[in-house]
Amino acid sequence: MDDKQHTSSSDDERAEIATSNQDQETNSSKRVHLKRWQFISILIGTILITAVITVVAYIFINQKISGLNKTDQANLNKIENVYKILNSDYYKKQDSDKLSKAAIDGMVKELKDPYSEYLTKEQTKSFNEGVSGDFVGIGAEMQKKNDQIMVTSPMKGSPAERAGIRPKDVITKVNGKSIKGKALDEVVKDVRGKENTEVTLTVQRGSEEKDVKIKREKIHVKSVEYKKKGKVGVITINKFQNDTSGELKDAVLKAHKDGLKKIVLDLRNNPGGLLDEAVKMANIFIDKGKTVVKLEKGKDTEAIQTSNDALKEAKDMDISILVNEGSASASEVFTGALKDYNKAKVYGSKTFGKGVVQTTREFKDGSLLKYTEMKWLTPDGHYIHGKGIKPDVTIDTPKYQSLNVIPNTKTFKVGDDDKNIKTIKIGLSALGYKVDNETTQFDQALENQVKAFQQANKLEVTGEFNKETNNKFTELLVEKANKHDDVLDKLINILK
């Protein structure tokens, strides 16, 4: 199996992945030769509520990997002996794969580091899909609404679009099997599969139900969206993946063609991605030979610099960056660089604050180890880990847009005291219901408002915040957040 190749190139530089034989346990340790320097491929990642996204970077390493000392060798021998004993002598037959995974998980857990983890072959595949933006499927965005799986929209030119799938189509079966009661991610997994294989969707459109056969293909999800809002160009960057820099460049050129001078780069809830893309993206606005990020391990520091001239069409643009607490990793690298060079003004709320770096090692069986190895700093030397980047101008996110999802396995009623009850109160207030406090107490006044909510949405009126009420509550808050972007609207008004 070949390593996934992470490259960084420009007109006069080309990065190549070279296989290292220094690590006998791994299929290959990723190495990059860039001009006369030797780098290793590393990852900066962040863990948010629902996902882990990583970022590729490059760091100069002077030292060779050292051999094991006597103590290390003794410990390794002990681990090997325990594995052999339990695998062969334990009175119940053991799964050797599970034993080895448990041993690795135990070592990683001992680090007490949320950014270090061991990924199985399947998890590694998803990890790589997230970094590349490529997956095999039909190219249809879906959502769960009213306990139904509904197509939000088929991607332009996708197999789903060519097969006639339309927005608001309800999927009832996948390959003849009902999906009733299944979670959205389970349905997505069923729809995806191997390239050039077929999947049959049973689709309900109005009163009509029919089967649609669709051939799965490799799909690339774009990471950049551009739209014109009055005299302001809004460029939304969802993550930093392969060729995000190219997509950003295209968006900037479109804005220039539209005659726009004021540009908003929306990085809210962008959890990160490839660092070499972040460097290339910064290079669109920052001239050649400037440091974008500093990588530090012990006493060793390496400055990662831009390699091209800035894009001439971007030089006269007034750049604003919009961030929030979900902007992390590569988002912070990019924002920190433009802020340090006074190339952009930062708006919104404080960023996540992720300033450590992970290295990945992939094993022969396709599994992967990710562990923290170093930290990164902005060009001016700011270490933002645990602190985040403070905006130049604060625009607070409405409370309801920052709420955690309430578990639908619990029912809340009068007399209960729980942190989720505060979330219920904030959410109901945002939806127009009268709530006079934001405590964690489920009081009589809240019961009355829950009853009003249930009645308005044709649910069983009990006054208890149960699973059905929770699902509708979450659905309406998501719809409200998608329809009304108060923070972006405030920023555009500031820029007028």
UniProtKB/Swiss-Prot annotation:
Biased composition (Polar residues): 18-27
CDD domains from the UniProt entry: cpPDZ_CPP-like, Peptidase_S41_CPP
Active-site residues from the entry: 329, 340, 354
Residue numbers spanned by region Disordered: 1-27
Gene3D superfamilies: 2-enoyl-CoA Hydratase, Chain A, domain 1, 2.30.42.10, 3.30.750.44, PGBD-like superfamily/PGBD
Bilayer topology: Single-pass membrane protein
Catalytic activity, EC: 3.4.21.-
Amino acid composition bias (Basic and acidic residues), ranges on this chain: 1-16
UniProt main location, coarse: membrane
SUPFAM superfamilies in UniProt: ClpP/crotonase, PDZ domain-like, PGBD-like
InterPro entries: ClpP/crotonase-like_dom_sf (IPR029045), CtpA/B_N (IPR055210), PDZ (IPR001478), PDZ_6 (IPR041489), PDZ_sf (IPR036034), Peptidase_S41A (IPR004447), Peptidoglycan-bd-like (IPR002477), PGBD-like_sf (IPR036365)
Domain PDZ: 124-206
Gene Ontology terms for molecular function: endopeptidase activity; serine-type peptidase activity
Record's keyword terms, sorted: Cell membrane, Hydrolase, Membrane, Protease, Serine protease, Transmembrane, Transmembrane helix
Subcellular location: Cell membrane
Membrane-spanning residues: 39-59
Gene Ontology annotations of biological process type: proteolysis; signal transduction
Range of residues in the leader sequence: none
CC annotations in GO: outer membrane-bounded periplasmic space; plasma membrane
Family designation: Belongs to the peptidase S41A family.
Record-given protein name: Probable CtpA-like serine protease
